[in-house]
């Protein structure tokens, strides 16, 4: 059963927020709005700058922090920038700052051992650009066709990654079908079908919201939900 919760909170002028996306409410009830790649990348890492607005007033929500993993296909280009024993792939992400958890890649070869590293160029105040290591792995295959994964321990700050494979004295691997796995989460709130609503994000200096909805957080998270739809920015 949905808790008794006001569907509007304080008024808000969204001028300080960098981005907004329309939210489509298709059914009345408790809503679950999953953040898109653009929203989760554009919002603060703690989600404290997220605001739902309807007719100039905030819509109170709670955050469902259960991690959801989604997959995107990036734009990838092989390059011989280093030559020699290394193969280098440039990976273009769809948005800057996407919280990538790992890369997944296919290869037809069934017997190999390779060290792989993922890096990105970062601007350092007063020092120009430096290459930062975001993650790496040691790939092994001994006749099987297991998935090739590269976990990232540091999230990208930009939208360009560099994958380097150390081939040793072996022929390069025929890597293909690159996938980017990223983490996202959802907002839970009450709304009526057709409510005109927008999600605002991208305001690093604002305080996190404090809604009365926090008092019924467990009830909201446990309630039956319908999926709201987040449109492209």
Q: Residue locations for each model-derived region?
A:
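Extended non-catalytic domains of envelope/secretory-pathway proteins
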Residues: 1-233
């Amino acid at each position: 059963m949905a808790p008794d919760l006001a569907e509007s909170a304080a008024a808000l002028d969204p001028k300080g927020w960098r981005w907004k996306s329309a939210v489509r409410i298709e059914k009345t009830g408790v809503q679950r709005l999953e953040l898109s790649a653009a929203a989760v990348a554009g919002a603060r890492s703690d989600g404290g700058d997220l605001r739902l607005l309807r007719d100039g007033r905030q819509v109170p929500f709670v955050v469902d922090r259960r991690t959801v993993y989604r997959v995107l296909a990036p734009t990838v280009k092989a390059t011989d920038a280093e030559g020699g024993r290394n193969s280098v792939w440039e990976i273009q992400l769809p948005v800057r700052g996407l919280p990538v958890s790992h890369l997944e890649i296919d290869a037809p070869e069934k017997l190999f051992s390779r060290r792989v590293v993922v890096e990105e160029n970062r601007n350092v105040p007063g020092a120009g650009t430096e290459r930062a290591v975001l993650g790496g792995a040691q790939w092994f295959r001994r006749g099987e066709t297991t998935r090739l994964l590269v976990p990232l321990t540091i999230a990208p700050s930009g939208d360009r990654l560099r994958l380097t494979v150390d081939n040793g004295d072996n022929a390069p691997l025929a890597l293909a079908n690159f996938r980017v796995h990223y983490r996202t989460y959802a907002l839970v709130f009450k709304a009526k079908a057709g409510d005109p609503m927008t999600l605002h994000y991208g305001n690093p200096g604002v305080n996190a919201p404090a809604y009365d909805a926090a008092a019924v957080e467990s009830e909201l998270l446990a309630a039956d939900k319908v999926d709201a739809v987040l449109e492209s920015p």
